[in-house]
């Protein structure tokens, strides 16, 4: 991306780091403190970061007059945002469902990913749940999607690591990534409440002494990350069936670069910081532990900033990616209004994941495009993120979900500058 001359004028009413939005070549870091004054900065060489306003990429010179809060809104207008679908892969043997069996859910997931790519979506992601009529074994599906698409990212949001053998998973992930040409984006996590009590026990896993199941999930994740480094760890047999390369052996197939495409699904600020320390990307969800009592999007924006701070402190050299998931429906015809026009959840909800864990569940967005655009501009977590996953009602079928995607891409995304 070329360097561009930029004149920046800011009205400052709170501490603000300009370097959070721009890579500065002549000014290493610019901190603007509240003193009630206007300050003019000449920055001869400013390079937009990946999540910086796309307008800077098009204009030779641009002048901005704003407070940090206004800047937050303007960044939403010119944003390089990766857009993906997120399917929970439900099926129900009901006449009202277009996905009435596991085969329906799997095959329609493949078809929808291909259709999403044709429409201009950037990714297709899938939720993984066990002991439920939902997608549970992601790697065959991801590999199949990889053979039917050419460009879009293919991922999960998320795989429950309490259920995973990290060695099998490293082999499966490597194979699926190679089949897709290096397009996997794997979201993993410690998991959510499941359909059965301690379901991971039926898969043969037990927490170590002093661990709970969340600790076990994080331990499995760390083992998985280590295996993806492709470093030898297994002592070779001196009399092997086939000739071994020199040194310790590692798992095959190995896919270089996959380690940098692992995301952690975080429901708290603490686990977001933990993920940053380990060099994982961040996936936020449609729910979060309620840590402040504020609306979900504000809590998630703070969570994202905590993640970035921890990432910087860890000294990683690459730029991390951050996603948010939202239910967004543009009401443009009678079908949309019939499905989502009335009774949509317009406010966050509070619930309990267990006896001690209070959680906040995000609202749905369903409105006419012009109203939707204004609502989404105010979502601070979307503004902070570089990737937006749109949860889709997969049981309504491929055709209708393609319509939902196309409506967002054509009636909402352009006005918000989502490229």
Predicted regions and their residues:
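N-terminal beta1-alpha1-beta2 module of alpha/beta enzyme domains
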Residues: 67-152
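An alpha-helical appendage that flanks or caps ligand/catalytic pockets
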Residues: 67, 71-77, 207-251, 284-285, ...
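Flexible, glycine-rich active-site loops centered on histidine and acidic residues
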Residues: 78-102, 163-233
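Conserved, mostly hydrophobic/aromatic
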Residues: 83, 128, 145, 176, ...
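Extreme N-terminal basic, low-complexity initiation segments
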Residues: 1-16, 21
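Glycine-rich, proline-tolerant flexible connector loops at the mouths of alpha/beta enzymes
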Residues: 123-141, 286, 290-293, 392-400
């Amino acid at each position: 991306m070329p360097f561009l001359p930029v004149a920046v004028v800011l009205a400052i009413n709170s501490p603000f780091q300009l370097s959070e939005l721009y890579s500065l070549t002549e000014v290493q870091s610019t901190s603007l403190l509240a003193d009630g004054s206007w300050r003019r900065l000449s920055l001869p060489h400013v390079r937009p970061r990946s999540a910086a306003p796309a307008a800077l990429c098009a204009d030779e010179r641009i002048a901005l007059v704003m407070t940090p809060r206004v800047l937050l809104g303007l960044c939403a207008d010119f944003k390089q945002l990766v857009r993906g679908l997120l399917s929970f892969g439900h099926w129900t043997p009901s006449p009202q469902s277009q996905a009435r069996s596991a085969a329906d859910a799997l095959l329609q997931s493949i078809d929808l990913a291909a259709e999403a790519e044709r429409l201009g979506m950037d990714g297709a992601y899938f939720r993984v749940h066990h002991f439920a009529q939902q997608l549970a074994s992601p790697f065959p599906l991801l590999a199949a999607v990889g053979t039917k698409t050419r460009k879009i990212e293919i991922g999960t949001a998320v795989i429950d690591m309490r259920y995973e053998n990290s060695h099998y998973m490293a082999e499966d992930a490597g194979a699926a990534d190679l089949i897709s040409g290096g397009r996997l984006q794997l979201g993993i996590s410690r998991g959510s409440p499941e359909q059965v009590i301690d379901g991971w026990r039926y898969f043969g896993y037990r927490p170590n002494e002093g661990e709970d199941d969340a600790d076990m999930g994080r331990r499995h994740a760390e083992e998985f990350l280590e295996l993806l480094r492709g470093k030898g760890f297994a002592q070779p047999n001196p009399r092997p069936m086939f000739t071994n390369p020199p040194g310790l052996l590692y798992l095959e197939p190995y896919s270089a670069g996959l380690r940098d495409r692992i995301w952690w699904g975080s429901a708290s600020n603490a686990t977001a910081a933990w993920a940053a320390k380990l060099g994982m990307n961040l996936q936020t969800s449609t729910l979060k532990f309620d840590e402040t009592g504020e609306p979900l999007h504000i809590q998630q924006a703070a969570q994202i900033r905590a993640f970035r701070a921890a990432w910087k402190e860890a000294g990683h050299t690459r730029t991390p990616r951050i996603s948010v998931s939202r239910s967004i429906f543009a009401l443009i015809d009678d079908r949309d209004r019939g499905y989502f026009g009335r009774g949509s959840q317009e406010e966050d909800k509070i619930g309990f994941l267990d006896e001690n864990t209070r959680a906040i569940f995000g609202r749905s967005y369903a409105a006419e495009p012009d109203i939707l655009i204004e609502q989404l501009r105010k979502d601070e977590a979307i503004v902070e993120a570089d990737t937006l996953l749109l949860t889709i009602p997969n049981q309504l079928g491929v055709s209708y979900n393609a319509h939902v995607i196309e409506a967002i891409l054509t009636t909402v995304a352009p006005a918000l500058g989502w490229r």
